[in-house]
Amino acid sequence: MESRTTGPLTTETYDGPTVAFMILGAALVFFMVPGLGFLYSGLARRKSALALIWVVLMATLVGILQWYFWGYSLAFSKSAPNNKFIGNLDSFGFRNVYGKKFDEDAYPELAYATFQMMFSCVNLSIIAGATAERGRLLPHMVFLFILATIGYCPVTYWIWSPGGWAYQWGVLDWAGGGNIEILSAVSGFVYSWFLGKRNEKLLINFRPHNVSLVTLGTSILWFGWLLFNSASSLSPNLRSVYAFMNTCLSAITGGMTWCLLDYRSEKKWSTVGLCSGIISGLVAATPSSGCITLYGSLIQGIVAGVVCNFATKLKYYAKVDDAMDILAEHGVAGVIGLIFNALFGADWVIGMDGTTEHEGGWVTHNYKQMYKQIAYIAASIGYTAAVTAIICFVLGYIPGMRLRISEEAEEAGMDEDQIGEFAYDYVEVRRDYYLWGVDEDSQRSDVNHRVNNAHLAAERSSSGTNSSSDGNGEMIQSEKILPIHQEDPANR
């Protein structure tokens, strides 16, 4: 028997399971935010690990605030049918969003607004990775608020609002290949260009500081992505289940393909490569999981794994320090997913929700779908790049809105300079050792003393002693000895 719920501010009734499905979907999409934080933190160096978690979480707070005030109204106004570019402010502050948006809806508009709010938050959180190890946090939050208003809201209106030009034209974008993946990738890449490269001397022997965090973040993202894609059906139906399975198929083939490519060159089974491939497959599934066939998703994951793997080299040709490879893994994979909608989109898959009618793509002989998808991709890239560049340019002339931290702060790390707290606060860090005025002979003597103590600790450990101490009773452990005035940049 159908469950019914009556809203407190309206006499309209809603389908209870549908409302619960949307709220659960919103909650699990939000769970992707800490996943992104852990992923970015693990890929960075230790001295900026906490700052990346902070910036991803704060981006979510900014996204919710913007969405409540005017974001939802600009992206989904139902009273602006003649405007194909952006909505109006009729729903400012979630005004009049408590009833049904359309008569045939089985859920309140507030549930839909809340669900879409989490998509906006994920979009901003992806962009936040562009600040990695060198971006000031306050200007970036201002940037995100403005970009959400004049960047994300218009592109979302194009594709998901009934008044948008891409929606009316029949472009296929299931869960945000253009307004989320391409927009975040292009915006992050342009923002990285304005920030400039990190200090190359500090990047010697650079490697992710915690691959376990990378794996944890990827796993959380995959978990949230399943509802990110399947809940985009807005009701628990066959199409949502189909999108769930398509997401898994694209992710596994993407991960396997990327991992094999890395093994071919390094002869090692890279965990970071595996995670990168999984993410590329998930991103490709975002616009296509509710539109293409299951075998199409298998092929899509392979293509995404190969193309995105090689696309990580684009930043070197463009001379842009895209530290988190946002362009390769989100932008390129998002384009692949949108193209696959034209290649493998099927009318019978799209119609599985029982309400949507579309001719599909080449699988069902709708060959004109390709140029529509390409036009949408080009519009999303061009508009996002222009808006991002304008915002960054203007912010650069506003006092206090300098985008980048100083060279000294970059050497110290964003955790110390921007946060004042540390992800790994084991000991007090002194970075002014080169100003102490101690002669090199004294420093070498101290190094030799530490080496001898380390050997002594190792000998005692091998004889059954778990720890040792020097003559002053201080605990000793083996440590890596570096030349005078040199610090291992990969472990900072």
Swiss-Prot record:
This is Ammonium transporter MEP1. It comes from Saccharomyces cerevisiae (strain ATCC 204508 / S288c). It comes from the Eukaryota. GO terms for biological process: ammonium transmembrane transport; nitrogen utilization. The keyword Nucleotide-binding does not apply. Its main location: membrane. Keywords: Ammonia transport, Membrane, Phosphoprotein, Transmembrane, Transmembrane helix, Transport. PANTHER family: AMMONIUM TRANSPORTER MEP1-RELATED (PTHR43029:SF4), AMMONIUM TRANSPORTER MEP2 (PTHR43029). The chain crosses the membrane at residues 19-39, 50-70, 110-130, 141-161, 175-195, 211-231, 241-261, 269-289, 291-311, 332-352, 374-394. Transporter for ammonium (both charged and uncharged NH3 and NH4) to use as a nitrogen source. Can also transport methylamine. The affinity of MEP1 is about twenty times lower than that of MEP2. MEP3 has the lowest affinity. Belongs to the ammonia transporter channel (TC 1.A.11.2) family. One of its GO terms (molecular function) is ammonium channel activity. It holds the Pfam family Ammonium_transp. The modification Phosphoserine is found at S442, S445. Residues 40-49, 131-140, 196-210, 262-268, 312-331, 395-492 are cytoplasmic. Residues 455-492 are annotated as: Disordered. NCBIfam families: amt (TIGR00836). Residues 1-18, 71-109, 162-174, 232-240, 290, 353-373 are extracellular. One of its GO terms (cellular component) is plasma membrane. It is found in: Membrane.
